[in-house]
Structures are given as structure tokens and as C-alpha cells.
Amino acid sequence: MVVKFTKSEALHKEALEHIVGGVNSPSRSFKAVGGGAPIAMERGKGAYFWDVDGNKYIDYLAAYGPIITGHAHPHITKAITTAAENGVLYGTPTALEVKFAKMLKEAMPALDKVRFVNSGTEAVMTTIRVARAYTGRTKIMKFAGCYHGHSDLVLVAAGSGPSTLGTPDSAGVPQSIAQEVITVPFNNVETLKEALDKWGHEVAAILVEPIVGNFGIVEPKPGFLEKVNELVHEAGALVIYDEVITAFRFMYGGAQDLLGVTPDLTALGKVIGGGLPIGAYGGKKEIMEQVAPLGPAYQAGTMAGNPASMASGIACLEVLQQEGLYEKLDELGAMLEKGILEQAAKHNIDITLNRLKGALTVYFTTNTIEDYDAAQDTDGEMFGNFFKLMLQEGVNLAPSKYEAWFLTTEHTKEDIEYTIEAVGRAFAALADNK
């Protein structure tokens, strides 16, 4: 099968004349998979995409995670339509934002108080500000390879040592800002302890993806998150969970419910918007009371809590409350994992597959992936070839070796069976070109 992308290629050529790099987020380009024009989608329904050339795909991108209920879910679409008919932006309080805040609190008991913002980046950025206001300290800690949005303070790399002050990961981020960030490897208690022994008295908070989603799906080792809480609290700092990817993705109550570990502050996004722009943050009452108008930590937003996003988020959570959906995602995920591993063995392709319920990552390596260094040391060229072969098979993945495959509640066993067959054909082609 040879799929043509003529219209996507023409559209990308035109986009390059008007939009920086031809895309509105760099992760949408095909730079990480060998280049070429990214595929422009025209519509989505359920588990499927159709591009501007009319090609149909089974979608495992899910907009990098938010689309857990599938594209154009009727309950969510109706809620958005009703909100639009009533006016999408007021600049005033609404009943919808109160209802949605109550739903989030009921789902995640660690949220005594909630504030809505417009993106995951904004949610994380503000939790850092609140933690600094509460503790009176300035430094933060993060784990290498964990992405927490594109604000200056979190765009840092690990530096040259195992536990270092940060170095900028983007042009335009001053070294002085990066020096406020301490980066340590994920799943390594000893290095975390060493860093806290050295800098703990200056640390306001540690940012934690409780289940990593940004160098693939990587779970914490048993007891790791509990030890993080213990060591960080001993240092007088706060624990911030970045659940922008994980909240409502693996379990209704988020990773903190699934893993049984409670943070001081939580940042949310992606799934909670039902596909519309959103972010939220919340936590313990005494910490959240640092936020204006109650406290000195200022945060505001013209679009924050807009009725359309609130309505979409409420509708999404109502869908996810239906019995058996998370069990279905886990069942389909297990089926997909088993099939991919069988195809890899059949065609002698070396892979490591990390899966948690309805999300997984295929790494082209034989190594165990438990931290960022291991994820980096995988075959990006082979992934790029695999990605393009899967496009030809009508299977849409994220164009990066670090990203996850996300299942939706609309995927079927037939979709999984076809995907496994497509993986087999792609692996056969890779084996022929070794």
C-alpha cells in the first residue's frame, strides 16, 4: 500500500510561508523522524483521523493525550455547542466553574482549593510561584527528561553531572534563571538525597511526574515516590505533582490515587479540558491561600475558567465516570502490548515496551528504560523509519521516539488487531533493511 500525501505536502509548503516552521508546536513537525511534511488532518471521529488527502488512520496520538474519549464525542460536543450558543467568554464568575472545581476536588482529595488557568504550562508555572511564596525559598528541583511546559524555569537540562544546577535547554532562557533549578535523575533516591543535602535549605519545591510521560511511559520504582515525599518534606520543601498527562488518563483520581501518594500541590491539564484549552492547579488550603486575591502570589487570566472549556471539561469527566472505561483501556492496552512483542520476536526486532493501562511506548533497544539516560540511548533512526511505515499502514503515532501511544475509549479490539498486523508488516520491512 502506497499512501499519497500530496495535499499535506502542498499545505505544509504554504504554511512555511506564514507560520514559523510551518507548525504551531515544534513537536508536530517531522524533524525528529527524518523530516518531511507533517500530515495535516481534516477531521476526527472516535478513534479515527482523516487527513486532507482523504487517508484514514487509527489514531494513537490522541492530541498527545487529551483525547481519551475519542474525537468528537457526542456528549462533549453537545456541551461545547451549548456553551458557544450561550456565549464563550464573560469575564465573570460562572456556575460552570464552581461545578467543575467540585468535580475535580471529589476526584482528587489532595485538592482543597482549585484555580483554573489556560494550559498545563501555566498550571505548572503558577504552582512554582505559589510554592515559592509559601516557603520563602527560590530554587526548585526536577527530574531529568521530565517536561513541565515551556516556561523559562523548567526548560533546563541536567548539565554534566548526575546532580547539578540547571543549564538552559532553550535559547532565550537566562543562565541566572536556570541556576535556580536542580536536576536529578528519575528513580534514583541516592542522588536525590545528595542534592537535598547540598541545596535542600534553598529548595521551595520539587516537580514530579508521578508516572513519566515525556520520555515515554516510565513508572516509578516501588517506594520511590514515598521516599521523595519523605526527603523533600524533611528539607522543608513542597512536593508538586505535574499530572498534566496522568490525571484521568490511568485512573479517574489520577496517578496520586493509583499510586497512593499525596502531593502538596497538583498541576492539571490535557484530559480535563475534553479537547479544549485548559489548565488547573490546586492543593492544600493553607498553601493555596497564598494566591491572590487572598494572598500575595499573583495569577490572573482573561480566558481562565471560560464557559466553553468548563463545559467541555465537565462533560469529559461525566463520560469518564461511566463504569468499566478504565478497565477497557487496560484490556486493550494489554492486547496491543502482547501483539507488538510477538511481532518483534517474530521478525527479530529489538524493542523494549513500557505500558501502563491504556498508554505505552515502544523503544528500539534491548535495555530497560527507567530514566532519561536510558530513553536517550535508543535508536531514533529506526523509530523514524517505523513511524513512517506505520503512516503508510494507516496508523497515526506521535512523531518522536519519546512519546507515548495513547488509547481512547473509542478504540475497538478490531482496531488493535489491525494495528498489530500493521506493526508486523512494519517490523518485517525494518528487518529486510537491516
UniProtKB/Swiss-Prot annotation:
| Key words of the record | Cytoplasm, Isomerase, Porphyrin biosynthesis, Pyridoxal phosphate
CDD domains recorded: OAT_like
Question: Which enzyme class?
Answer: isomerase
In its UniProt record, a GO molecular function of this protein is: pyridoxal phosphate binding
Q: What is its EC number?
A: 5.4.3.8
For the modification N6-(pyridoxal phosphate)lysine, which residues carry it? 270
- Substrates-to-products reaction catalysed: (S)-4-amino-5-oxopentanoate = 5-aminolevulinate
Q: Name residues in a coiled coil.
A: none
Q: Which Pfam families match?
A: Aminotran_3 (PF00202)
Q: Report the main location listed first in the record.
A: cytoplasm
Write down the required cofactor(s).
Answer: pyridoxal 5'-phosphate
Taken from the UniProt entry, a GO cellular component term is: cytoplasm
Is the Chloroplast keyword given for this protein? no
Q: Which PROSITE patterns match?
A: AA_TRANSFER_CLASS_3 (PS00600)
Q: In which pathway does it act?
A: Porphyrin-containing compound metabolism; protoporphyrin-IX biosynthesis; 5-aminolevulinate from L-glutamyl-tRNA(Glu): step 2/2
Where in the cell does this protein reside? Cytoplasm
Task: Please name the GO terms of the biological process aspect recorded for this protein, alphabetically.
Answer: protoporphyrinogen IX biosynthetic process
Q: Which family does it belong to?
A: Belongs to the class-III pyridoxal-phosphate-dependent aminotransferase family. HemL subfamily.
What is the protein's quaternary organization?
Answer: Homodimer.
- Put simply, this protein is called Glutamate-1-semialdehyde 2,1-aminomutase 1
